[in-house]
Amino acid sequence: IFFADDYDPNGVNERASEALILAVMQLKNEPWMKDCRLWMYRGQWGQWEIDNIEMTVPMSPEEFGVKRQAILKHQSQVHDAPFRDPENGQLAWQTSIDRNTALADLYSRLGLASYEAMEAFVRYHIED
């Protein structure tokens, strides 16, 4: 299960994440849950520190284009919504795209394979 972490200062991702975690906690003793993994990503509101990243998903130029188009299908991402980056004034989708390319550039500079973009994830561990 992939979900946004709760770093969103507008509270939308936080509420969705809380609902997901509550549901998972209610289901944690189901047999299929032993094979279930929860992975958190960050959208517009920041990036994981490199030493905290547990998984990355590299994207080719074509895959990155598909992601960009998928983001733009959401009305909240294309209009002049109040969800702008407080530092540079970009819309959420622009910041997310920039974050994905910046991570790929960082991995390349570290001597790892080069990709168009990368999404980073940190695993959420279900409490007992």
Task: For each feature predicted by the language model, list its residue ranges.
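Metal-dependent de-N-acetylase/amidase catalytic core
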Residues: 1-128
